Amino acid sequence: MSEIVWRAEPLAIAASNIQDFTNTLGAKDYDDLLAKAAADPDWFWDQTIRYMGFVFEKPYDRVRDLSKGAAWTTWCLGGTTNATLSLLDKHRDTPTYDKDAVRFEAEDGTVRVWTYEELDHQTCRLAAALTELGLGPDDKVGIYMPMVPEVVAAFFATARIGAVAVPLFSGFGHEAIATRLNDAGATAVITIDGTQRRGRLIPMKPVMDQALTNVPSVRHQIVLRSHDVALAWDDNRDHDWAGIVAGKPNFVPAVIVDAEHPLLLVYTSGTTGKPKGTILTHVGFTVKIGFDLLVCMDLKPDDRMMWISDFGWVVGPMITTVCCLAGATMVLVEGTPDYPEPDRMWRLCEEHKVSFLGVAPTTIRGLMQAGTDDVEKWDLGGLHVVASTGEPWTDEAWKWCFEHVCRRRAPLFNWTGGTEIGGGILVSTFMHPLKPCCFGGAVPGMEADILDDAGQPVATGEVGELVLRAPSIGLTRGLWRDPERYMETYWSQYPDIWRHGDWASRDADGLWYVHGRSDDTLKIGGKRTGPAEIEGLVMATGLITEAAAIGLPDPRAGQSVMCVCIPSPGVAADENTANQVRDAVAAGLGHAFRPKDVLFVSDLPKTRNMKIMRRVVKAAAQGQSSGDLTALVNPKAVDEVARAAGQVWLISPCAETNSMGSYQRKVILVDGALDAAILPD
């Protein structure tokens, strides 16, 4: 079992938001807080809403209604509000109104700063323009923009008029955009001419124009001009941002809506079929995301948060919402963390005085390849918290980040949940010690547990399904236009219990761990493990940059392990490397999990938030349909995996095999370059 590597100092615990919240609710400690929340959820969420300072126009009569079942819980009955009352209006006539709300750095180094006053004015002017176009609470507004200051105004203006924002990944092609806009029934979109990425201007309005040829419901397209480029223009549909906001007032009142009115319609990838539309409400999303980051992870008004992401993933709306709820400053960045210099991310931290840094394990693994010189030369002493979400860590990457980014001083807080949760299920706080890759505990108010297939809690150290025994205020209100899919996906395995689809465990110290998606689990000869454990062992060899471990049908063991690997720079994709990969897994997990197949590729299929899509890898390796691929940033990687894996099925085994019937296959070169190699054992 790993050793504890960090504990907060007593003074830091005493000064933390989680300690203040615990004291306010009269709990003795974190475990007592969990127990009180489970014993009286209505009391807990009522206290949480009050503590967060969420503003209602009309107070609610009841905290929640479960009369239709846990899956269809409604919240804050009778209450009316608008999220922007808590994000903008409450800061007027306070010192916060004059402080920085948004700091932005473009890829070329240009910096722009908006105060809360400027953000408020920009939001209200655009809201007035949208209202003049006839948009209001019945409308869905697609937002297809990079993380520039105006994306915050676009989101808040949409919310202010009561319309529903539909975030769209800035790297989507026209088909993915059209699919989501049609499903949402969008009537307007807000976009930009283009954005810089790795030294190139990436067009965005032309992509949206092409998408809109297949979306007849969209009547209006608002376009932000940020570059001197010629644009095709439809006078009946297109509106120049600067033109429509000119002369509009700096203040317009928020349209008051029901507390349960949708704020966001966020699409996530579906395993099969169309993407899933999650419905996040004004009260639900704002309170839940605020509780997780302000209370649990200690975001404070004087923090500057940087979390390099995209508005099309829920982290984008999260950053904008939680920073303004706290009165903190968001640091937005155009482009990638390693361009134009490999140390760009660390320079941004020092120069913008970032104190709350969000990272993804994939990003850290990529930056690790440059060594430690790039990170060590920058002053990261201002970091108060480093937070992580998106996927499980490998032990090596977590330790590297804790050592070289956190400097063993700032905590590395793990946080897991998802778009459908509207926040997290597991989190770390200043009250919890840290071990590599751990979560401190469950988020209060959700009754997280770990169950076996029969619905019984698993023993300490055992792996099971991560579930919620109680609905949370942040949960999606179903799936857009698909209630049957919602019930089947999340509520069908255990009665009135949310099954999240992740494998999790708890150790003897009460710390939690996530082992990957439960539908990615490998079961070899009756023994079960998550792919993250195998992948961690593979990457710990130093030979492999990234890996995806999948299970393939095997007549003897039920499943056999295939590792699809990206070799580290300078490492040969040959039998020697493949055998070292096999040996590392066997040494760590036992011979039963020794990979039968090792496949080398140049890229792995990833989503917009850089998660490796194992289900896509598995489908490609078996020549099956990969389902919805619109969220992939690199769909060509699917073809590469399929092409390489096809060598197993299309080429007969060598005549000479060992007693187990296994065989070796040589590296395959395509057009004189390494394409892929499948090396069965």
For every predicted segment, state its role.
Residues 168-194, 208, 350, 357, ...:
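AMP-binding/adenylate-forming catalytic core of the ANL superfamily
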Residues 33-36, 84, 98, 102-156, ...:
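Conserved AMP-binding/adenylate-forming core of the ANL superfamily
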Residues 18-19, 23-25, 87-115, 225-233:
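AMP-dependent adenylate-forming
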Residues 441-445, 456-490, 529:
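Conserved ATP/PPi-binding loop(s) of AMP-dependent carboxylate-activating enzymes
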Residues 98-100, 221-223, 234-267, 274, ...:
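Conserved pre-ATP/AMP-binding loop-to-beta segment of ANL
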Residues 160-243, 360:
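Structural core segment of the AMP-binding/adenylate-forming
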Residues 325-328, 354-359, 368-434, 447:
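Gly/Ser/Thr-rich phosphate-binding loop
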Residues 286-304, 314-355, 370:
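Conserved AMP-binding/adenylation subdomain of ANL enzymes
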